[in-house]
Amino acid sequence: MAAAALRARLNAHIFRMYAEGVVEEETFEQLREDGTATELARLLINEAYEILHDIDIRMEEPEVDIDEVEALTQQLMECASSVGAQQVKLACMHFGDFYEIKCKQGCLVSLDLVRNLYCIVRNDVEIMMQLEDQIAACGPK
């Protein structure tokens, strides 16, 4: 596929990410202009995966230390904010709300939402990175 067609696909994909609220446009556009969007997106994918894995381990313990889980959720919220993943950030905030009132069931439901939204962000960012790699393989503009 020609570089121009790949760029068009990339732009359409990123526009869809904005339209669906996967990433916040202003934040992500600033990162793209700075040339750091892809690097930060890779960090988000890796760090968020590790954090979610740590949360899963803690949630499987017989006595869940919800304070530890809340601290990990705060870390995840910071990661999500770095690339403008507002839906993930909001889901983390919902967890915090349930944590404040000590509602374990609400915490569990909100963690499921966090995981699902993270998967959406991860998949969309991976598609974006694949398109960028294909464009780079086409050579200079």
Q: Which residue ranges define each predicted feature?
A:
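Two-component system phosphorelay core
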Residues: M1-K141
